[in-house]
Protein backbone atom coordinates (compact mmCIF):
# COMPACT_ATOMS: atom_id res chain seq x y z
CA UNK A 1 0.00 0.00 0.00
CA UNK A 2 1.80 3.10 -1.28
CA UNK A 3 0.23 6.57 -1.18
CA UNK A 4 0.03 8.85 -4.23
CA UNK A 5 3.30 10.55 -3.23
CA UNK A 6 5.17 7.23 -3.21
CA UNK A 7 5.35 6.64 0.54
CA UNK A 8 4.44 3.40 2.29
CA UNK A 9 2.52 3.93 5.59
CA UNK A 10 4.51 2.54 8.47
CA UNK A 11 4.87 2.67 12.26
CA UNK A 12 8.03 3.15 14.28
CA UNK A 13 8.41 2.13 17.92
CA UNK A 14 10.62 3.71 20.56
CA UNK A 15 10.46 1.34 23.53
CA UNK A 16 11.84 2.69 26.84
CA UNK A 17 12.60 0.96 30.10
CA UNK A 18 12.12 2.53 33.54
CA UNK A 19 15.46 4.38 33.20
CA UNK A 20 14.40 5.88 29.84
CA UNK A 21 16.90 3.78 27.96
CA UNK A 22 15.68 2.76 24.52
CA UNK A 23 15.47 -0.65 22.90
CA UNK A 24 17.72 -1.20 19.89
CA UNK A 25 17.47 -4.29 17.72
CA UNK A 26 20.37 -5.50 15.58
CA UNK A 27 19.25 -6.43 12.09
CA UNK A 28 19.82 -10.10 11.29
CA UNK A 29 23.17 -10.68 9.57
CA UNK A 30 23.89 -6.94 9.47
CA UNK A 31 25.85 -4.51 11.59
CA UNK A 32 23.09 -1.91 11.80
CA UNK A 33 20.81 -1.29 14.76
CA UNK A 34 17.31 0.13 14.59
CA UNK A 35 14.03 0.62 16.38
CA UNK A 36 11.22 -1.83 15.65
CA UNK A 37 9.11 -0.68 12.72
CA UNK A 38 6.82 -2.06 10.05
CA UNK A 39 4.13 -1.43 7.49
CA UNK A 40 0.51 -0.64 8.18
CA UNK A 41 -1.74 -3.20 6.51
CA UNK A 42 -4.91 -2.22 4.65
CA UNK A 43 -7.72 -1.54 7.17
CA UNK A 44 -5.32 -1.42 10.13
CA UNK A 45 -4.94 1.64 12.35
CA UNK A 46 -1.45 2.86 13.26
CA UNK A 47 -2.00 1.64 16.84
CA UNK A 48 -3.08 -1.83 15.65
CA UNK A 49 -0.03 -2.00 13.37
CA UNK A 50 2.23 -0.92 16.25
CA UNK A 51 0.97 -3.74 18.50
CA UNK A 52 1.29 -6.29 15.67
CA UNK A 53 4.85 -5.18 14.86
CA UNK A 54 5.77 -5.13 18.55
CA UNK A 55 4.67 -8.76 18.86
CA UNK A 56 6.29 -9.88 15.59
CA UNK A 57 9.65 -8.18 16.13
CA UNK A 58 10.06 -8.04 19.91
CA UNK A 59 7.58 -10.62 21.24
CA UNK A 60 5.80 -8.13 23.49
CA UNK A 61 2.04 -8.02 23.97
CA UNK A 62 -0.09 -4.96 24.80
CA UNK A 63 -0.04 -5.84 28.51
CA UNK A 64 3.78 -5.59 28.51
CA UNK A 65 3.80 -1.91 27.49
CA UNK A 66 2.16 1.44 28.10
CA UNK A 67 1.75 4.02 25.32
CA UNK A 68 3.33 7.31 26.44
CA UNK A 69 2.86 9.24 23.21
CA UNK A 70 2.84 9.27 19.43
CA UNK A 71 3.97 11.72 16.79
CA UNK A 72 1.44 14.34 15.74
CA UNK A 73 1.96 13.70 12.05
CA UNK A 74 3.73 11.43 9.59
CA UNK A 75 7.53 11.57 9.52
CA UNK A 76 8.99 10.66 6.11
CA UNK A 77 12.24 9.34 4.77
CA UNK A 78 13.31 8.62 1.22
CA UNK A 79 14.99 5.33 0.40
CA UNK A 80 18.00 5.56 -1.93
CA UNK A 81 17.17 4.26 -5.42
CA UNK A 82 19.68 1.43 -5.20
CA UNK A 83 17.76 0.07 -2.17
CA UNK A 84 14.40 0.03 -3.99
CA UNK A 85 13.19 -3.14 -5.72
CA UNK A 86 13.21 -2.73 -9.51
CA UNK A 87 9.47 -3.30 -9.83
CA UNK A 88 8.80 -0.45 -7.36
CA UNK A 89 11.11 2.13 -8.95
CA UNK A 90 9.22 5.13 -10.22
CA UNK A 91 6.27 4.63 -7.84
CA UNK A 92 8.03 4.17 -4.48
CA UNK A 93 10.00 6.91 -2.71
CA UNK A 94 10.20 5.75 0.89
CA UNK A 95 8.25 5.43 4.10
CA UNK A 96 5.98 7.71 6.08
CA UNK A 97 5.79 6.79 9.72
CA UNK A 98 3.74 7.42 12.82
CA UNK A 99 6.05 6.90 15.79
CA UNK A 100 5.00 5.59 19.20
CA UNK A 101 6.83 6.01 22.49
CA UNK A 102 6.20 3.03 24.75
CA UNK A 103 7.22 2.20 28.31
CA UNK A 104 8.05 -1.44 29.04
CA UNK A 105 6.01 -2.38 32.11
CA UNK A 106 6.87 -6.05 31.75
CA UNK A 107 10.29 -7.58 32.30
CA UNK A 108 13.32 -7.73 30.03
CA UNK A 109 12.77 -11.49 29.94
CA UNK A 110 9.43 -10.87 28.17
CA UNK A 111 11.37 -9.76 25.07
CA UNK A 112 11.58 -12.53 22.47
CA UNK A 113 13.27 -11.95 19.14
CA UNK A 114 11.94 -15.31 17.90
CA UNK A 115 8.22 -14.59 18.30
CA UNK A 116 7.81 -14.56 14.51
CA UNK A 117 8.71 -17.11 11.85
CA UNK A 118 10.64 -14.31 10.11
CA UNK A 119 12.67 -12.56 12.84
CA UNK A 120 14.03 -9.08 12.12
CA UNK A 121 16.67 -8.94 14.86
CA UNK A 122 19.34 -11.30 16.15
CA UNK A 123 20.37 -9.22 19.19
CA UNK A 124 19.06 -6.36 21.28
CA UNK A 125 20.25 -3.89 23.91
CA UNK A 126 19.17 -0.94 26.02
CA UNK A 127 20.95 2.32 25.15
CA UNK A 128 20.90 5.94 26.25
CA UNK A 129 17.85 7.79 24.87
CA UNK A 130 20.11 10.06 22.83
CA UNK A 131 22.40 7.31 21.59
CA UNK A 132 24.67 8.24 18.71
CA UNK A 133 23.12 7.47 15.33
CA UNK A 134 26.24 6.10 13.66
CA UNK A 135 24.95 2.50 13.84
CA UNK A 136 21.65 3.48 12.16
CA UNK A 137 21.47 3.30 8.37
CA UNK A 138 22.12 6.82 7.11
CA UNK A 139 18.82 7.51 5.30
CA UNK A 140 16.80 6.86 8.51
CA UNK A 141 18.84 9.05 10.87
CA UNK A 142 16.92 12.32 10.45
CA UNK A 143 13.56 10.63 11.07
CA UNK A 144 14.97 8.94 14.18
CA UNK A 145 16.19 12.30 15.50
CA UNK A 146 12.83 13.97 14.80
CA UNK A 147 10.88 11.15 16.50
CA UNK A 148 13.16 11.09 19.56
CA UNK A 149 12.97 14.88 19.91
CA UNK A 150 9.19 15.12 19.54
CA UNK A 151 8.43 12.18 21.83
CA UNK A 152 10.90 13.11 24.58
CA UNK A 153 8.31 15.53 26.00
CA UNK A 154 6.24 12.51 27.10
CA UNK A 155 8.92 11.19 29.45
CA UNK A 156 8.71 11.99 33.15
CA UNK A 157 10.27 15.36 33.92
CA UNK A 158 12.95 14.18 36.36
CA UNK A 159 14.14 11.54 33.89
CA UNK A 160 13.67 13.49 30.65
CA UNK A 161 16.81 13.61 28.51
CA UNK A 162 18.09 17.11 27.82
CA UNK A 163 16.87 17.65 24.29
CA UNK A 164 18.67 20.75 23.08
CA UNK A 165 22.19 19.81 24.07
CA UNK A 166 21.86 16.19 22.92
CA UNK A 167 20.28 17.00 19.54
CA UNK A 168 23.11 19.47 18.88
CA UNK A 169 25.66 16.73 19.61
CA UNK A 170 23.87 14.21 17.39
CA UNK A 171 23.67 16.54 14.40
CA UNK A 172 27.44 17.02 14.26
From Swiss-Prot:
Residue interval(s) of motif Nudix box: 38-59
Residue ranges constituting the Nudix hydrolase domain according to the UniProt record: 6-149
A Pfam family of this chain: NUDIX
GO molecular function, one term: pyrophosphatase activity
Main enzyme class: hydrolase
PANTHER family: ADP-RIBOSE PYROPHOSPHATASE (PTHR43736), DIHYDRONEOPTERIN TRIPHOSPHATE DIPHOSPHATASE (PTHR43736:SF1)
Family: Belongs to the Nudix hydrolase family. RppH subfamily.
NCBIfam families xrefs: PRK00714.1-2, PRK00714.1-4, PRK00714.1-5
Record protein name field: RNA pyrophosphohydrolase
Biological classification of the source: Bacteria, Pseudomonadati, Pseudomonadota, Betaproteobacteria, Nitrosomonadales
Amino acid sequence: MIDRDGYRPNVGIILCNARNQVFWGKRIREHSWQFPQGGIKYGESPEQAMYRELMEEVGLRPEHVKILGRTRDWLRYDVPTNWIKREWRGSYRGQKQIWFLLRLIGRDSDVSLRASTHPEFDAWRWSDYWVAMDSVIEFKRDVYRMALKELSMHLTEHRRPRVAERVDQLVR
